[in-house]
């Protein structure tokens, strides 16, 4: 193999697949943006192959015409079909006081 070919070779063992990355986040805080106008920040307790997500100690953020509304929840189960973005360690949107 030439030096050029070798430098373009991808080391697959050092890469994480998406579900592996989510699995590494179990027990950690995660920020989740949904397809609607809601976002959630909580501690990831678990998920399944469909990326249905179970969180605890959750803050829900909803964008309304009046501004950003926040709600505290003990637990929530999110439908994976509506998940748009996952941010490991994310803190959620900045709330103006």
UniProtKB/Swiss-Prot annotation:
Query: Which stretches make up the Sm domain?
Result: 17-92
Q: Name one GO molecular function term.
A: RNA binding
Q: Which GO terms describe its biological process?
A: mRNA splicing, via spliceosome
Q: Which UniProt keywords apply?
A: mRNA processing, mRNA splicing, Nucleus, Ribonucleoprotein, RNA-binding, Spliceosome
Task: Indicate whether Ribonucleoprotein appears among the record's keywords.
Answer: yes
UniProt cross-references to CDD domains, sorted A to Z: LSm5
Q: Which Gene3D superfamilies match?
A: 2.30.30.100
Q: Which GO terms describe its cellular component?
A: Lsm1-7-Pat1 complex; nucleolus; sno(s)RNA-containing ribonucleoprotein complex; spliceosomal complex; U4/U6 x U5 tri-snRNP complex; U6 snRNP
Q: Where does it localize?
A: Nucleus
Protein family (similarity comment): Belongs to the snRNP Sm proteins family.
Q: What does this protein do?
A: Plays a role in pre-mRNA splicing as component of the U4/U6-U5 tri-snRNP complex that is involved in spliceosome assembly, and as component of the precatalytic spliceosome (spliceosome B complex). The heptameric LSM2-8 complex binds specifically to the 3'-terminal U-tract of U6 snRNA.
The record describes its quaternary structure and partners as: Component of the precatalytic spliceosome (spliceosome B complex). Component of the U4/U6-U5 tri-snRNP complex, a building block of the precatalytic spliceosome (spliceosome B complex). LSM2, LSM3, LSM4, LSM5, LSM6, LSM7 and LSM8 form a heptameric, ring-shaped subcomplex (the LSM2-8 complex) that is part of the U4/U6-U5 tri-snRNP complex and the precatalytic spliceosome.
**Official protein name in the record:** Probable U6 snRNA-associated Sm-like protein LSm5
Organism in which the protein naturally occurs: Dictyostelium discoideum
